């Protein structure tokens, strides 16, 4: 039976590799395993060994490193010799089994079956379900949007879907503050990454927002960006012995990069390196800070302009157009499409021409009759349509309400498609989006302690009092008296303690200017008053901040108060709390709005109570009064705050330095009057049609509801738990819809992505994930699930299995073969062909006569009748039935080959129908809307042609198989 030189593998120790017989007698056989440098002696009667024999069509490796494509297998005196052609040169070659590579592995299902590498039946089932789920997720229209750790806000989802599915989107996101521009950008990016259209992304932000973006992308989207600054880049700077620069481009080292635009403006060399690197998508936050004028664009604007010209996809996040002024607004649009927005004066003329149409839309939205002028404006824009019958339906009192509604909606749809900037500009306002709470301001006036008064006097005599010293006197006092503690006498602390005790059942967020202030406050509350508190500042790691946030979010045993520095709270929202204490007042309106915005979000269920303790006759009091009575910035959002701060800032500075100066009341009146004027101009300039397009209406609402239905999906929960079990992760149900996942010593892989060293808590519940940022929110989009599916489907888990079928109606010993084939196409990721033809599992269930019973016998139904087989019995069945199994595999190949044309035809029809419809729509609209870019249409047509070509090349491969043997019991 055994001949010296033959190759065998161990059924019980597959990891030893390919063994070679070195000795054999009547009782034992000795096998050496060169790859593992091990030797085993087996008793002949129970040797767990399987003979290795490759087949025609296999590609095998020689011990010398070259590969042979097997064309013929010859056996001579117990030895196997393989004949064929070398893969590298095509020359004919001979490879005796003695010269096979010792590290051979079996990846084909049939090879694994016949080499005793047989898996458990439940793993075969998990593999098939993983393939099914993978197919479904590739085709899901919700992919890239449902996994976000955020509330499902219809207008955000609408913009994300509309823009995220485009080829190389170039848009301006200009929602009002608090409406989620960052979330919209993240969802657009996520879809582009999932589709493969985008791989390398650069995010440019003001320096103060870098960490906010880093946190938002990680916590909300599971996207791990890298922060680039001078210190990081300098590590790549190198010179040779002659002093020549041989530096590598640091920006080529990571795919997802965040950088400060302020830093790049001041560092020409780094800006040059950014331009030299290739990017698929550019995202610019606070883009309105890029100063532009027709004759003198800023350095930052010119840099972004060059970058935008060489980057296919561009997202600009900016303040609303009305805040910017038309010239600045035009400059942003020109970055997106310089050919379309080439002349400022032409743009202004076009905007003026369009205003009457926007007014007419407001009339339509209010269900009022259209005036003669409004009808003319609409008819002129829709010149190719006969609008007269539509106007009659709208204006006639005899028209049925439902008919009027239908016509109004049709007209609005037509006008949206022709809107001047509707494809490049999205803007929602708070007036157009429901769900915001009221804001209530409480000013607490306290007497300034003598210690602060004296410190300010002394510093004044020394000529060194700064604005920060007066706004934050505790820092000045501590600097001058290191041994003393400001917290021992500051009346704000006693007020805060009393306030917390009077509101024990409420969550309260306290924001301070500095981390040191927050740390000192939290220590006093916790140690002196035993108040459950947490601290949150920029010196903490993201994990530490997550824990603090989670402690604050717990309703029963959690912290009553979270004390945060202003920088530490960036990127975090706490809408489950409704009390905000501004222990230190921000020194400009934008920062004030940012602080209030931590609570003032969509999803906030209560009115927000804003408490500002400040000292009487102080700079704090002047600033708080100006914010409240001049800007009304505490009780309403103030989109014109930055403009008013620029306009009145110098005059305000005088009152800040001298709080008791005459004329302050008159100054407040003038500020408020100007605020009302700007507010009216903003309202007058609102483009209702643009808002309607950006809002998404009922379609957006339906999208949110569809995603909500997928939350806590039982199929996902069951699959995830089975997946974790197979991977070897320990699971502990904590209740409250959360599970602790812990690594063990018997995992399939040493490190599973997303699992911490000790443990990770996960949930399938969106609301819990929103409250507890230390808990991972699992959806089909989460890396833990996606990586788990990849681990199963790309590896050998469940590729071959053998089971017993308990069925009294079948003769004992009846052989069935369940084969899972994959139909797929090897196309560039950027084509996003998985929408039409994802890797598709096709199940074939053959009886012993070769008839396919898959349509009659469901996978789940069959699974319930199967029983496991131990490994020894499975190996025995595989050996005994090898010839019959091979025949059934041959028949299954004929079956899948017959099914392939139908699958290709359906995918081709889907692709052609979808892409042709979009192409027709864009081509039709291009005649009436200049914002349809010619290159976008060309790219779509090329995509259609290439997609159909690649789908036609689709083929099949055997992924996994299960042999089933019937038994009566």
Swiss-Prot record:
The keyword Hydrolase applies. Its EC number is 3.6.4.-. InterPro entries: Helicase_ATP-bd, Helicase_C-like, Helicase_RapA, P-loop_NTPase, RapA_C, SNF2-like_sf, SNF2/RAD54-like_C, SNF2_N. Signal peptide: none annotated. Residues 162-339 form the Helicase ATP-binding domain. The keyword Transcription applies. ATP binds at residues 175-182. Keywords: Activator, ATP-binding, DNA-binding, Helicase, Hydrolase, Nucleotide-binding, Transcription, Transcription regulation. HAMAP family: Helicase_RapA. Transcription regulator that activates transcription by stimulating RNA polymerase (RNAP) recycling in case of stress conditions such as supercoiled DNA or high salt concentrations. Probably acts by releasing the RNAP, when it is trapped or immobilized on tightly supercoiled DNA. Does not activate transcription on linear DNA. Probably not involved in DNA repair. This is RNA polymerase-associated protein RapA. It comes from Actinobacillus pleuropneumoniae serotype 5b (strain L20). The gene is rapA.
